[in-house]
Amino acid sequence: MARITVDDCIDNIPNRFELTLAVTYRARQLAQGSQPMVESKDKPIVTALREIAAGKVGREILNRGRA
């Protein structure tokens, strides 16, 4: 598989700090058993980056669970 970088994801979430939060939040979900939205046999953090780069996950993940 091709290597995934932060630069591949920055188009979908332009703020690097929000991108970091979104990746860690999604990686935690994947590690706890959530189904991946892209086909990947990588670690949860890489899968989360791939999902964001593909546009399957975006900034909206940061707003989940807030009242």
Curated annotation (Swiss-Prot):
This is DNA-directed RNA polymerase subunit omega. InterPro entries: DNA-dir_RNA_pol_omega (IPR003716), Pol_omega/Rpo6/RPB6 (IPR006110), RPB6/omega-like_sf (IPR036161). PANTHER family: DNA-DIRECTED RNA POLYMERASE SUBUNIT OMEGA (PTHR34476:SF1). Promotes RNA polymerase assembly. Latches the N- and C-terminal regions of the beta' subunit thereby facilitating its interaction with the beta and alpha subunits. Its EC number is 2.7.7.6. NCBIfam families: rpoZ. SMART domains: RNA_pol_Rpb6 (SM01409). It catalyses: RNA(n) + a ribonucleoside 5'-triphosphate = RNA(n+1) + diphosphate. Keywords: DNA-directed RNA polymerase, Nucleotidyltransferase, Transcription, Transferase. One of its GO terms (cellular component) is DNA-directed RNA polymerase complex. It comes from Thiobacillus denitrificans (strain ATCC 25259 / T1). GO terms for biological process: DNA-templated transcription. The RNAP catalytic core consists of 2 alpha, 1 beta, 1 beta' and 1 omega subunit. When a sigma factor is associated with the core the holoenzyme is formed, which can initiate transcription. Belongs to the RNA polymerase subunit omega family. It comes from the Bacteria. One of its GO terms (molecular function) is DNA-directed RNA polymerase activity.
